[in-house]
């Protein structure tokens, strides 16, 4: 599927969802996922340009969140979109797909590079993004009878067929 066409269908479907006060993601993302064979160089450049556009960047975050993997060429632009996102509660939309596909150390290295070489606003953005760019360790106490055991685990990402998206869970 063509990226520009997919975006146009996405926007139309998203507008319909909002108009009807429905929650969910546009179905075109699932269709794209089923037909996805990889991105061309043109697709990658288009997605990079979309990440610099305040409206189109959300499409890229949603699209990559639906794919099993995506090229390393999109990692830094995705993280940069998280850094420049003014609302810290939304920058995870760009980081979550990266966490699922790439190593935490690689993500943190890129963010630290942006911090070292960035402007004051970029440095503030990196500090906000680092909140999401870390392995999450969970500790769970299980009470069974008179016995208390503690379990620890990390985030694990898996495709949820019912929700048609990747979700993370405790493992």
Model-derived features with residue positions:
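Amphipathic alpha-helical scaffolding segments comprising HEAT/armadillo-like alpha-solenoid repeats
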Residues: 1-11, 37-49, 70-82, 104-115, ...
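Long, helix-rich interaction regions
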Residues: 1-23, 91, 115-171
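Alpha-solenoid helical repeat architecture
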Residues: 17-21, 36, 48-52, 64, ...
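Structural detector for internal amphipathic alpha-helices that build alpha-solenoid repeat scaffolds
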Residues: 19-38, 58-70, 90-102, 124-136
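Alpha-solenoid helical repeat scaffolds
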Residues: 36-37, 48-49, 61-71, 77-80, ...
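Context-gated lysine
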Residues: 37, 48, 56-57, 96, ...
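Glycine-centered secondary-structure boundary/capping sites
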Residues: 51-56, 103
């Amino acid at each position: 599927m063509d990226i520009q066409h997919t975006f146009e269908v996405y926007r139309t479907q998203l507008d319909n969802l909002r108009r009807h006060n429905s929650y969910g993601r546009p179905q075109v993302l699932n269709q794209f996922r089923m037909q996805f064979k990889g991105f061309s160089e043109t697709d990658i450049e288009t997605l990079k340009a979309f990440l610099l556009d305040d409206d189109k960047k959300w499409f890229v975050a949603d699209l990559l969140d639906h794919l099993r993997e995506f090229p390393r060429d999109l990692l830094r632009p995705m993280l940069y979109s998280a850094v420049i996102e003014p609302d810290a509660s939304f920058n995870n939309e760009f980081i979550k797909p990266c966490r699922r596909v790439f190593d935490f150390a690689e993500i943190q290295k890129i963010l630290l590079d942006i911090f070292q070489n960035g402007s004051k606003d970029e440095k503030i953005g990196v500090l906000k993004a680092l909140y999401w760019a870390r392995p999450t360790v969970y500790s769970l106490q299980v009470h069974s009878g008179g016995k208390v055991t503690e379990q620890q685990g990390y985030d694990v990402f898996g495709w949820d067929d019912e929700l048609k998206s990747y979700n993370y869970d405790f493992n």
